[in-house]
């Protein structure tokens, strides 16, 4: 995983979605389509980010257990943030929000 300072803005938006869902106890697993809506990014941007974050151990995923016939739609891949990923996300987002990282006219 690159240092959090090298995380792209869209990757930080994705991590923020997970932290928000986790801290609000809304749900522990989130489908890609829901992440897209919450983060406001396209599927072409989202899925490569999810793959990189999963390979780095920041996220984990699984397929829904139900079959497409049971669901009446294709199965979804569900993503969750790992404990290590939560620590990385908190640190990256806190650093991003700290006054020392803001431009002089933003402080």
Where are these regions (language model features)?
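Amphipathic alpha-helical dimerization/coiled-coil segments
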Residues: 1-3, 84-107
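Exposed loop/turn and edge beta-strand positions of beta-sandwich/beta-sheet ligand-binding modules
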Residues: 75
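Alpha-helical residues within the helix-turn-helix
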Residues: 37, 54-55
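Residue-level signal for threonine
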Residues: 8, 82-84
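N-terminal helix-turn-helix DNA-binding core of bacterial DNA-binding proteins
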Residues: 5-45
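Short, hydrophobic-biased segments on the C-terminal half of alpha helices
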Residues: 47-54
């Amino acid at each position: 995983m690159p240092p959090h300072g090298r995380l792209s803005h869209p990757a930080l938006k994705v991590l923020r979605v997970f932290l928000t869902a986790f801290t609000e106890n809304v749900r522990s697993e989130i489908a890609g389509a829901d992440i897209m809506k919450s983060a406001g990014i396209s599927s072409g941007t989202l899925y490569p980010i999810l793959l990189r974050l999963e390979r780095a151990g920041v996220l984990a995923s699984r397929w829904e257990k139900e079959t497409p016939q049971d669901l009446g739609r294709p199965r979804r891949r569900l993503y969750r943030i790992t404990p290590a990923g939560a620590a990385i996300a908190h640190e990256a987002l806190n650093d991003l929000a700290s006054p020392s990282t803001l431009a002089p006219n933003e402080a």
